Every structure is written in structure tokens, then in C-alpha cells.
A protein has these predicted regions:
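Mature extracellular/periplasmic domains of secretome proteins
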Residues: 129-142, 160-164, 244-249, 254
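Active-site histidine-acidic residue metal-binding/catalytic motifs
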Residues: 2-135, 154, 158, 164-168, ...
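Sec-exported extracytoplasmic/periplasmic mature domains
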Residues: 52-63, 137-141, 150, 211-220, ...
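Extracytoplasmic/secreted proteins, especially bacterial periplasmic and envelope-associated proteins
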Residues: 42, 46-49, 53, 127-131, ...
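Active-site-adjacent mobile loop/cap segments within catalytic or ligand-binding domains
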Residues: 155, 172-179, 184-201, 207, ...
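Loop/turn elements at helix/coil->beta-strand transitions in domains of secreted/extracellular proteins
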Residues: 11-13, 60-65, 139-145, 251-255
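Short beta-strand segments
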Residues: 17, 147-151, 258
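Histidine-centered active-site/metal-ligand motif
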Residues: 20, 149, 249
Length: 312
């Protein structure tokens, strides 16, 4: 606990992990969204903006705050071209022995069955997360990681995306391992390591507190999973357990945030404007910044949790 008179987050080390990469990599990651020429949002860039806002706010409350990535660039030193052999092996296991090199002009299954697509996915979904885990576990060594993301519903073809009427919020903790996942030795090891580290003892109540703060700040309803890869957790409608690479590899409590639907029309308009304080006129009415509400919700939730659990 902090000494009397010190800020509530004093002596805590918090790592902020802005999801995805953004920048020139956003189209490859399929995290680039534009409904008309001259405007676009990229999840990796929005997550980085949110992380920078949170870094300042949490530091003001006494925390030592470190960003896992500070630029719209990969943490991993590998690139898709370095992963072609692994991509070929994946396709071979799928029964595709002579895959196309490039996905230019292809879509759907034909695109995903190319060496280029598989190598790119290994780059940004696997190699990048392992590199971040190395940075978190070996260099930063935080008390808590906040993985900052924004959600989306299916928007169809990238060149002609569709708006969704849905807008929602959920928070993820590690769990809900499937039998197929547990057939893999590395997954079993990483699961048992988290159990023995007892990360869940803090992760669950932290996630519930952050979920409450986010729900209050954003006004978003809880997302409801209809697939078996997630289940409700922490006695909170907004919190689900799910086995993701990041929340499995990071060796500390991990709160993984998924607020907003980026292709919800009003949310998209708010996100186009980025971060601001106060209110601005959007769609004929004064509105707050979605990213400011995001940051406010995280701060509100963390403050509530640590005020309760770190009494001097």
C-alpha cells in the first residue's frame, strides 16, 4: 500500500500495450477502415493515442507507466518475408502443397490460402505478440498490463465497408481453454504457469473494476459472445474469459479491453476526430471524444480498485 498522503497508484508499474501496429501496417493487419476518400481510422493508431493519454493520467496518479510500443511500428524484428517457410508448412498441413505466392486479385478462401497471407498473419499475430511478451516479461516487468484495443463488427469488403448498428463493450481475462488448444504442449505450459503465478487472483477483480469504469464512462452495453471460445467471468456482464496469445504469454495480470464498434456510424465519426477534451459538434449534436471516454473509464476503474485494495 502507498504511504498516507501519496497518490493511489504510487509504486505501481503499469504497462500499456496499444493493440495492433497501425501506421503503414494497418491495411495488412485488416485494421484500416474508410467510408470515403480522404478519411480513415486505424485501430493501431487509435490505440496508441489512447495509450499516450493514459500514460499521462496514470503517471499523475503516481504510477510508473511504460508503453510496450511507442510508435506505429512492429516490436518484432521479423518481417513476413522471414516467415515463408513456416507459412508453407501451415498450408501443407491444410493439404495445400503448391500455394500461390501472392494474394493480389484474390479474396476469401483463395486469399487465405496464399503464402503471402499466411506469412503476414504469422508476422502480426504471432511473431509480434511474442516480441511484445519478451519486452513485457524481460524488460518492463510490470505489475499489470492493459491491452488497449477497439472492437468491430464484420464490415464486408475493405473497399466497400458497411456500417453496423451494434456498439458494445467487453473486457477479457485469460481462460476458457479448449480441448484442441490444450493438445499443444506450449499452451498447456503457459496455462499452468499462469495458474501457479496466481495472476487470476488480481486479474479477475481488476477486470471487473475496469469494466465498471468503462461502462460508466462510455455508456456501452455488454457484448454477448455466442461462440464457445469465451465464457463470462468475474461475475460481471462485461467480462469474459478467453484464451488469447497476449493474455496467456504476459507473466502478470492482464486486462484486455475491447470497447466500441469502429464501424458503428456514430462511433466512426467520433473516432475520425481523434482525441479532444470537452465536446464538439458531430452529427448535429455536441459529443465527447470516444478516446477520452475510453481513458476516463480506465482511470476510473483502476482508481476504484486500488483505493479499495491499497489502503495505507
Amino acid at each position: 500500500p502507498p504511504q498516507a498522503g501519496r497518490p493511489v497508484l504510487s509504486d505501481l508499474k503499469i504497462a500499456l500495450d496499444p493493440g495492433h501496429i497501425g501506421g503503414a501496417w494497418a491495411r495488412m493487419e485488416e485494421r484500416f477502415l474508410s467510408f470515403q476518400p480522404g478519411e480513415a481510422i486505424q485501430e493501431g493508431d487509435l490505440a496508441l493515442i489512447t495509450a499516450r493519454v493514459l500514460q499521462e493520467r496514470l503517471a499523475a496518479l503516481g504510477a510508473e507507466v511504460v508503453l510496450v510500443r511507442e510508435q506505429p511500428e512492429p516490436v518484432t524484428l521479423q518481417r513476413p518475408g522471414d516467415l515463408m517457410a513456416e507459412a508453407a508448412e501451415i498450408l501443407k498441413e491444410m493439404g495445400i502443397l503448391n500455394p500461390a505466392q501472392s494474394y493480389e486479385g484474390l479474396a476469401g478462401d483463395a486469399k487465405s490460402q496464399t503464402l503471402q497471407w499466411q506469412a503476414e498473419k504469422l508476422f502480426y499475430r504471432v511473431s509480434e505478440i511474442h516480441a511484445r511478451a519478451g519486452r513485457v516479461n524481460e524488460r518492463i516487468k510490470p505489475d499489470l498490463v492493459l491491452c488497449l484495443h477497439l472492437n468491430a463488427e464484420s464490415w464486408g469488403a475493405a473497399e466497400a465497408p458497411q456500417f453496423s448498428p451494434q456498439n458494445h463493450l467487453h473486457i477479457l481475462v485469460n481462460g476458457c481453454y479448449s480441448a484442441v488448444e490444450l493438445e499443444q504442449a506450449d499452451v498447456r505450459f503457459e496455462m499452468l504457469r499462469r495458474i501457479f503465478q496466481r495472476a487470476h487472483e488480481q486479474e479477475l477483480p481488476l477486470a471487473a473494476a475496469v469494466a465498471d469504469g468503462m461502462a460508466f464512462a462510455t455508456g456501452l452495453p455488454a457484448y454477448v459472445y455466442t461462440t464457445p471460445n469465451a465464457r463470462r467471468a468475474a461475475g460481471n456482464a462485461h467480462v469474459y474469459a478467453r484464451n488469447l496469445l497476449a493474455n496467456r504469454l504476459y507473466e502478470c495480470p492482464v486486462v484486455y479491453l475491447e470497447p466500441y464498434v469502429m464501424n458503428h456510424e456514430e462511433t466512426y465519426r467520433r473516432l475520425i476526430h481523434g482525441h479532444w477534451l470537452g465536446r464538439t459538434l458531430i452529427g448535429g449534436r455536441l459529443q465527447t471524444s470516444a478516446l477520452e471516454d475510453y481513458a476516463h473509464g480506465v482511470v476510473h476503474g483502476l482508481t476504484a480498485y486500488y483505493q479499495k485494495h491499497r489502503r495505507p
